[in-house]
């Protein structure tokens, strides 16, 4: 048992036998819990272990203070249980308009390796942006928006009560069942396939499209920035897959071949690190049919590149990936994500530059034609 879980159990907040989490006890004893958790600083923060939400909140605050010239913490919304949702914006000052890369982790509560990767990604960018020419190049024209834990209520619940909880924690059917699958709640052919209207089910799609406060917060923000977002990345586990749209239909997005090409290159970069094999394809083709996913919704609103990463492993440990695998998982995934970002960057700015060259050539041709008439 983890030290924090031992503490919660001994304090009576983790009730044995699956009876649940006593919120009143948690509130009254929070101060005791805080004192019982070993003190840490950003310098000693380990990226090789899983962290409870309280430590992730503190990490976000401290990292935005230490690297304040590059990263800022921003309020996004609140969860059903009124926990604040924050994202980190990594940005270098620039006189030019910049495009956006979005990354979220932890939409499914039990997939702990996903928030671990979001933290790893932020750490790697911040520690290396001055010395790594590739990262410097990306930051000249791109801002990174990172939401380390989307499903905060569910994530906390996996630490206190049920390690394999998937959904959010909103009550339904007069409190007889809890939670919505937030990755079935987006407005992308909502609840048409691979989702359930029964609130007892793992894939309960909610009471309507974007019915949950967590999905509303994300959808509202993404909608407001959609014209500037080049790439939408949502990190999951497990299965070792890079998934493209769509899950709700066998039809493909207009740039499907290009997305597969970028995804396959990323899978190759990932494999080169430790030999881990990833498959690339649309969700409907290589995983299963599903509707209401954030990936499909992002593509439907016009974001050109949208991917789901299903991280390690392929089923041996499943959602309970050992901490010994955090570092290699994050290192190889970092290679894949940087490959995607390099390709997206090159495709956008190459086409933009090509467009400017074509326009300039046409203008020059018109000027020459006009001068010949004089």
From Swiss-Prot:
Residues 1-20 form the signal peptide. Its cofactor is Zn(2+). PROSITE patterns: CARBOXYPEPT_ZN_1, PEPTIDASE_M14. It is found in: Apical cell membrane. Residues 353-374 form a propeptide. It is a lipid-anchor; GPI-anchor. Its EC number is 3.4.17.-. The keyword Disulfide bond does not apply. GO terms for cellular component: apical plasma membrane; extracellular space; plasma membrane; side of membrane. Residues 49-344 form the Peptidase M14 domain. Keywords: Carboxypeptidase, Cell membrane, Glycoprotein, GPI-anchor, Hydrolase, Lipoprotein, Membrane, Metal-binding, Metalloprotease, Protease, Signal, Zinc. It is an enzyme of class 3 (hydrolase). One of its GO terms (biological process) is proteolysis. Its main location: membrane. A lipid is attached at residue 352 (GPI-anchor amidated aspartate). This is Carboxypeptidase O. It comes from Homo sapiens (Human). The lineage of its organism: Eukaryota, Metazoa, Chordata, Craniata, Vertebrata. The gene is CPO.
């Amino acid at each position: 048992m983890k030290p924090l879980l031992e503490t919660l159990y001994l304090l009576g907040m983790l009730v044995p036998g699956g009876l649940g989490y006593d919120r009143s006890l948690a509130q009254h004893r929070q101060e005791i819990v805080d004192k019982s958790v070993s003190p840490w600083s950003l310098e000693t923060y380990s990226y090789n272990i899983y962290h409870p939400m309280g430590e992730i909140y503190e990490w976000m605050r401290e990292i935005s203070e230490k690297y304040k010239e590059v990263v800022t913490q921003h309020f996004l919304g609140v969860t059903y249980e009124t926990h604040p949702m924050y994202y980190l914006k990594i940005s270098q000052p620039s006189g030019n308009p910049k495009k956006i890369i979005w990354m979220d982790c932890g939409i499914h509560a039990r997939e702990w390796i996903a928030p671990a990767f979001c933290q790893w990604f932020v750490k790697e960018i911040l520690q290396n942006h001055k010395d790594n020419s590739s990262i410097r190049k990306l930051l000249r024209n791109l801002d990174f928006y990172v939401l380390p834990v989307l499903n905060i209520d569910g994530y906390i619940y996996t630490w206190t009560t049920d390690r394999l909880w998937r959904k959010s924690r909103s009550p339904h059917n007069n409190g007889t069942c809890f939670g919505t699958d937030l990755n079935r709640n987006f407005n992308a052919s909502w609840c048409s396939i691979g989702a359930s209207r029964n609130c007892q089910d793992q894939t309960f799609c909610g009471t309507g499209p974007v019915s949950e406060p967590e999905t509303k917060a994300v959808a509202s923000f993404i909608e407001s920035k959609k014209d500037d977002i080049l790439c939408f990345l949502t990190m999951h586990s497990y299965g070792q897959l890079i998934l493209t749209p769509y899950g709700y239909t066998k039809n493909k997005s207009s740039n499907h071949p290009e997305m597969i090409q970028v995804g396959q290159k990323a899978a190759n970069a990932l494999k080169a690190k430790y030999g881990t094999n990833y498959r690339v394809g649309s969700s409907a083709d290589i995983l299963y049919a599903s509707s209401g996913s954030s990936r499909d919704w992002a593509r439907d609103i016009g974001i050109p590149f949208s991917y789901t990463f299903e991280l390690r492993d392929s089923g041996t440990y499943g959602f309970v990936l050992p901490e010994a695998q955090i570092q290699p998982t994050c290192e190889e995934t970092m290679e894949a994500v940087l490959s995607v970002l390099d390709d997206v960057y090159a495709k956008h700015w190459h086409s933009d530059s090509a467009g400017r060259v074509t326009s300039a050539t046409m203008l020059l041709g018109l000027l020459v034609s006009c001068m010949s008439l004089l």
